[in-house]
Every structure is written in structure tokens, then in C-alpha cells.
Regions:
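N-terminal, polar/charged subdomain of small-to-medium soluble alpha/beta proteins
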Residues: 1-118
Length: 118
């Protein structure tokens, strides 16, 4: 999986890069069956202080799968918690998409009259 990381309003430290890579390792396991053409874009940063008190961090994850774009966003007072929440949400969407694809294959086999595998 190809990963691009960018930061807005904060400096991109080695600790942030390591945290993102560690969290994305879970997603990498889920997308291996889609091939090496899967791209992930992660954006981390601080949000505007317009209506919120204190510092709020935002993490966005975009994963481009064949035929699907997965988007997840999370806000939290802790940057690392926001990264974790966004990656978990993206993982849930990828799992759901994989399940839908499997269901489509089963339906197609039923329609064609072939044997259905469990």
C-alpha cells in the first residue's frame, strides 16, 4: 500500500509518522487482496479554534481501492487518538466493502446456476 502523509497547522514529526505507519499496518493487512495499486492518503492537523475551546486535532484517511474510495475523519483533543479513530473507521468501511464484494460473487453464482461455496 502506498502511503502519503501531510500535516496542516502542525509540524510533521518522526513520532507522528511512526504512529501513522503503525496504525496503517492494520489496514495494510485488509487491503492486500486488492493488489499493490492501493493508495492511502493521511492528513493530520489542528482544526480552527472558531467554535471549539482548547486544541482539537483532526485526522483524515483516504484509501483508494479498485472501484471504491474510503474516507474517514476523526476529531479529538489528542492527535494520536484522532489518528486511531480515523484508521478504525476506515478499516470498518473496508471490511464492509469486502463483504459486499463477496456477497455479489455469491449472488452471481446463484444467478448463473453454479454451485455456491460457503
Amino acid at each position: 500500500m502506498n502511503v502519503s502523509l501531510k500535516a496542516k497547522g502542525i509540524s510533521l514529526t518522526d513520532a507522528i509518522k511512526a504512529a501513522v505507519e503503525q496504525k496503517l499496518a492494520v489496514l495494510d493487512k485488509k487491503v492486500t487482496k486488492f493488489g499493490p495499486s492501493v493508495n492511502a492518503e493521511v492528513e493530520v492537523g489542528r482544526t480552527t479554534k472558531h467554535h471549539k475551546k482548547g486544541e482539537l486535532y483532526r485526522a483524515e484517511v483516504h484509501v483508494r481501492l479498485p472501484g471504491k474510495l474510503v474516507y474517514a475523519e476523526a476529531l479529538n483533543k489528542d492527535l494520536y487518538a484522532a489518528i486511531g479513530a480515523a484508521v478504525r473507521e476506515a478499516g470498518a468501511q473496508i471490511s464492509s466493502y469486502k463483504g459486499l464484494r463477496a456477497e455479489d460473487r455469491r449472488t452471481a453464482k446463484k444467478t448463473k446456476g453454479g454451485r455456491e461455496s460457503a
